[in-house]
């Protein structure tokens, strides 16, 4: 197949969408497909993708996240590009101006389109004092995704939520986790030493954007309760974002490791003991899978990855979304009970063992083939290329 993937975020951007889309693109290429990635040009970075073709378009900085960019409209360029390339399918991962241009161009050229639902922007805007934009964002998401032949979602729970928003024709595509990279064997005593913890002192870790929409105040409260029982406990924060400065100013004992990638990120996960993830705005939460693969005891709200992959009390703790006190209690229980935490850590890795990237890419390939077949009955040339 010839597949064009449109995304407004791509490595070296550090977020779950960028990593997920990068894995899907390179996974398809490894299976012999011709893959084009359309994304905003990243200043100072030369596109060097051996396995996939890159079409870099104009972009602009995202407000409050200067390191991230969104693509500007480029419908005419995409129509010209695809008129020559003739992609069998288009996958649009993001709903910004670039994604909208891609949708219009694909529809104009009668190319089958599917979308991915990665971010609840309708939830995010309220955390930045823009709650009045919520109905506008919801209407945009509904209109955008309903133009696609299918919208790919990582959980049945999200499919049900989107159905309530009026977004139909969702199909399940699980998220992958690299269990070879994220592994308990990467635990590193030399990394823990500067954290000032002994062998038996629990380390709580947070990985992700340090931003208002992540509900970080609850994580702080949960840690302080644990620390009141275990003064040697430490809280390590991996990532960056607009809330970091204030968080550090109010919590001088917290350890901020900055952005970590690859094996360094895996070492940080494995060198901790408990992953407390307080976010209520995730469509999935890839970091939950990474923490579980690393053998951490996870406490999270009962949604996204936690809902899908945590057996409560066995491979982690998941609590109702409207019960912040239950989150604090669950984190405390996992932190103070060494036996419980040890059992949960072993079971956590087992729970995600089947989510290998190769398996998920094969599922993505199958979905794209089905999409093209459903649209090729009147186009024998298209069917012959599949």
Regions found by a protein language model. Give the residues of each.
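Carbohydrate-associated surface elements
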Residues: 41, 157, 176
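Conserved donor-binding/catalytic core segment of Leloir-type glycosyltransferases
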Residues: 197-224
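Short alpha-helical donor nucleotide-sugar binding micro-motif in glycosyltransferases
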Residues: 82, 145, 259-260, 267-272, ...
